[in-house]
Each structure stands twice: as structure tokens, then as C-alpha cells.
Regions:
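Active-site environment of divalent metal-dependent phosphoester hydrolases
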Residues: 10-14, 52-55, 81-92, 117-118, ...
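Accessory, non-catalytic peripheral segments of nucleic-acid enzymes
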Residues: 221-345
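Conserved catalytic scaffold of divalent metal-dependent phosphoesterases
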Residues: 86-173
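Structural motif
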Residues: 3, 43, 122-123, 149, ...
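Short, conserved loop/helix-junction motifs that constitute active-site signature segments
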Residues: 70-74, 141-145, 173-178, 254-256
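Divalent metal-coordination and catalytic microenvironments
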Residues: 8, 44, 49, 65, ...
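Core catalytic region of metal-dependent phosphoesterases/phosphodiesterases
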Residues: 2, 9, 13-116, 175-179
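Conserved beta-sheet core of the metallophosphoesterase superfamily
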Residues: 162-226
């Protein structure tokens, strides 16, 4: 038996942006559904954060999500666990967007509590987002389940949230040593340590996703093989502009159509050529253009300066400052805020 596994779709993501929905839809139209049909797959496992906004969703966005995705999904058996973005309260799953918005779809089974079931010859433990309301039963299932595979929406220490930025806190990998495999949503970057693997979301959504491969997976329960299906489409592109070394008169603008473009200006002498570049980008149909001017300093006296990421600098500052609070808790709070800020463009 083959099942499709997808996670962190955030179907209403980027505030329901029409540009992003067109990008999402292209993946479903050209990659996801054709692959399911070609592989003869009839079961889809959704590992959480199907929707993005915990508080609200506009009617127009919901209508196109239902028409373009969930109506097409009626031919499949769907098993969907809750993620942190689909629960209204942070300490309870009682009110959640999937149960409220998808009641009309009899083919979709939604899990707000841990649940064991079988696909083919494999036993699965489904672990929705763990909060105050389901923590006790979740802990018990993690410790006692005899399932082969655990699928959840988990926060596990040491994994990359985005390339180069590691999550600190949450559960330890050793907590899941009883399972042959652990597959999780939540972090959008694909990564693996030991038996634990973050599967990654299907498509780019923010600039920190640039060039980070995305897609979904197919699992064959009989061969125990997990296969990644890459999404070849990208919505963020970069142009390194240097009119001293390169002419842009024959530049291929079409590859930037329907994308968000960031121009990194290395050298700009021909201002007329640069303005023509901008005009042609908008003419071909880019969503937006951002320009980053670089400063070149020929003095190499600072070549040994250590470069640190934002989160490291924040943690070092907390370590140095004299404050009457638990610094570990403060670091976790700053990490959460930083991750949320990375999702704002």
C-alpha cells in the first residue's frame, strides 16, 4: 500500500494572497494530484497546519481552497492531525479550524488526540500538536505505543527550523527511540537525525525559504520505502546586478515571471540600464521587486571578524545582561518571537 504524506500546507498562508495561492495551486495541479493518480494512491496523511491563521479566514480565500483543493480531495481517504496553526487556543485543541471548516467532507478524518491505526502492514501512532489538554495522554502513548511509525506535529530539540537556525527546547530525540521511524511536520525545513525526520512543507512561503528544496512524500508500507517528490517551482528569485561585468540588454526576464525578485546590487554605473531592468521585470509580470545595495570596502583589516546569526547574538546578550528572570525561559521566548518574525515579509 502506498500513502501520500504532506504537511504544513498553510493553505490560507500569506494572508490569503492571490499570488501565493496561484503558486500553491500550481503545485497541486501539476505535481501533487497527478502524482497521486499516477501512483494509484488513495490515502493521504496530513501532518498538521493545513490552515495558517489560528483566528480567522476570509470567505473568498476559503472558497478557493475548497474548490481547488478539498473538492478534488474527495476521491481520497484523508487522515489529518492538528498542528499549532489550526488550534484557536494554545493550550487546547477543542476549537480548531479543520473541524469547523471541513465538516462537509466525509472523506476527511481529523485527529485532535493521539490515535493508533494501520496502513497496509505498518502500525502508526498519530500525534497531533501537544498542548495542555492532550499532554497526559500524549506522554502515555509516546512511552507505551507499539506502533512502527510515529507521525506528529512535534517540537524536537536540535532540529533546523530554517537552514542554519536550530530549535532549542522541546522534546529530546531519545523520547522516540521505541519507534522505527518518526515523521513530523511543524518545521518547514527538511532534516533528519537518527530515526527522526522532519518532512518539510510543500512549497516556499518566505524569503528564508529561498533555494530550500520543498515537496511531499510517498510511503510504501510493503517495501518500507519513503520517497520524496520534489516541488520544482520557486516563487523567490535573486538577481546579482553588476553592469561593469555584465550587460543586461539580452537578459532573460521570463524566468522571473510570477516571482518575488530581490536584486542584489554589486556594481551600478549605468543607471539607465538598471532602470530598464526594473521596468522589464514589472512588464514581464513579477509580483514585487526588492533592491539590496551592497557596500564594497577594499580595506580587508576586518577580514577576521566573526559573523554570528541573529539568534546567537540575542542569546549572548541575554547571557551577559543582569536580569532577575529565568534566562532559559527568556531565550525560548525570544526564539519563538524570532521564528514568528521570520514569517513576516
Amino acid at each position: 500500500m502506498k500513502i501520500a504524506i504532506i504537511t504544513d500546507q498553510h493553505l490560507d498562508g500569506r494572508k490569503g494572497s492571490a499570488a501565493f495561492w496561484a503558486f500553491f495551486k500550481k503545485f497541486y495541479d501539476e505535481i501533487f494530484f497527478p502524482t497521486l493518480e499516477r501512483e494509484g494512491i488513495t490515502t493521504v496523511l496530513d501532518l498538521g497546519d493545513t490552515f495558517d491563521n489560528r483566528k480567522s479566514l476570509d470567505y473568498n480565500t476559503l472558497a478557493r481552497i475548497k474548490t481547488d483543493y478539498f473538492d478534488r480531495l474527495k476521491a481520497y481517504d484523508v487522515h489529518m492531525i492538528l498542528g499549532n496553526h489550526t488550534t484557536y487556543y494554545k493550550n487546547s485543541s477543542h476549537i480548531n479550524s479543520p473541524e469547523l471548516l471541513l465538516e462537509q467532507y466525509d472523506n476527511i478524518k481529523i485527529y485532535s488526540e493521539p490515535y493508533e491505526l494501520s496502513f497496509g502492514s505498518k502500525n502508526f501512532l498519530l500525534l497531533p500538536w501537544i498542548n495542555g489538554a492532550n499532554q497526559e495522554v500524549s506522554e502515555e502513548m509516546i512511552q507505551k505505543s507499539n506502533a512502527d511509525i510515529c507521525c506528529g506535529h512535534l517540537e524536537i530539540d536540535g532540529f533546523e527550523v530554517t537552514p542554519g537556525m536550530h530549535f532549542q527546547g522541546g522534546r529530546a530525540i531519545k523520547d522516540f527511540k521505541r519507534f522505527d521511524r518518526v515523521w513530523s511536520g511543524h518545521f518547514h525545513h527538511r532534516s533528519k537525525k537518527g530515526n527522526v525526520q522532519y518532512l518539510g512543507n510543500p512549497y516556499q512561503m518566505f524569503w528564508n525559504d529561498y533555494k530550500d528544496p520543498r515537496g511531499f512524500h510517498i510511503y510504501d508500507t510493503e517495501t518500507d520505502r519513503l520517497t520524496w517528490k520534489k516541488n520544482p517551482f520557486e516563487i523567490f528569485t535573486k538577481i546579482y546586478y553588476n553592469d561593469v561585468e555584465k550587460s543586461y540588454h539580452n537578459f532573460d526576464y521570463n524566468e522571473h515571471k510570477d516571482t518575488f525578485v530581490k536584486i542584489i546590487v554589486e556594481e551600478k554605473r549605468d543607471y539607465a540600464q538598471y532602470e530598464t531592468l526594473l521596468d522589464n521585470l514589472y512588464h514581464v509580470g513579477v509580483h514585487d521587486v526588492k533592491t539590496v545595495e551592497t557596500l564594497v570596502d577594499t580595506d580587508d583589516s576586518d577580514s577576521d571578524i566573526e559573523v554570528k546569526d541573529t539568534l546567537t547574538l540575542l542569546n549572548e546578550y541575554i547571557d551577559d545582561v543582569d536580569i532577575a528572570v529565568d534566562k532559559t525561559d527568556l531565550k525560548r521566548l525570544m526564539q519563538t518571537l524570532y521564528i514568528e518574525s521570520c514569517e513576516v515579509v
